[in-house]
Curated annotation (Swiss-Prot):
It comes from the Bacteria. Pfam families: HTH_IclR, IclR_C. GO terms for biological process: negative regulation of DNA-templated transcription. One of its GO terms (molecular function) is DNA-binding transcription factor activity. Residues 98-267 form the IclR-ED domain. The keyword DNA-binding applies. Residues 21-83 form the HTH iclR-type domain. This is HTH-type transcriptional repressor AllR. Residues 43-62 bind DNA. The keyword Signal does not apply. Negative regulator of allantoin and glyoxylate utilization operons. Binds to the gcl promoter and to the allS-allA intergenic region.
Amino acid sequence: MTEVRRRGRPGQQEPSAQKGAQALERGIAILQYLEKSGGSSSVSDISLNLDLPLSTTFRLLKVLEGADFVYQDSQLGWWHIGLGAFNIGSAYIHNRDVLSVGGPFMRRLMLMSGETVNVAIRNGNEAVLIGQQECKSMVRMCAPLGSRLPLHASGAGKALLYPLPAEELVDVIVKTGLQRFTPTTIVDLPVLQRNLDEARACGYSIDQEEHVTGLNCIASAVYDDVGSVVAAISISGPASRLTPDRFVSQGELVRETARNISTALGLKPQAD
């Protein structure tokens, strides 16, 4: 007599279902491995560390790429966590963390600086804009949410870089390269390292028309309760208004805001 299995009842899985579950588990394992690897890795490293055939690994990466969970760097061929993963994680980000905790601080910074305030997080070897508080000025600089920013040539990107240990910092820069976007983009590694040393010392980074001509940005790192960098907060404005003579005063405002958000996230203030 043939057994009739009701929908939803537990029972032995069909071979196709077993294969589907296995593929899902492997896809999740790939995303978890990329996350633990700083957001990016080569297909051969993924295959080796997850003990998967190279062809299977590549096929799974292509499926994940189709859903925008990963993307492949056209220069190095490395695979990176994509915006699809960010969009799913943004539900968590929206309900807890920098945006929900930092909202009032962002608005205060916008009012005091007179410039648009942005929040960015690191996504592999790029910074991604996840939050914004537009200023009231008729002329204002606003990038769309989800915009990708180069780590070496943006205020937020450099604020995500300068807290990193020296070895990790160099490793990230080597992976990303030093692409020139404007005449003032820093494309020399020793010069960038000195620039980041200065940013670390004063607590904020400066992008002086290094990514977009006519746009200046000042940013500072935001830390969680264990002292890990979780985001960067920045102000951006036209170079004609956010001028070099205002960098120090505005930088101090940005630094103070980043510290306040970090404290609200649970970071214990360090004794002087």
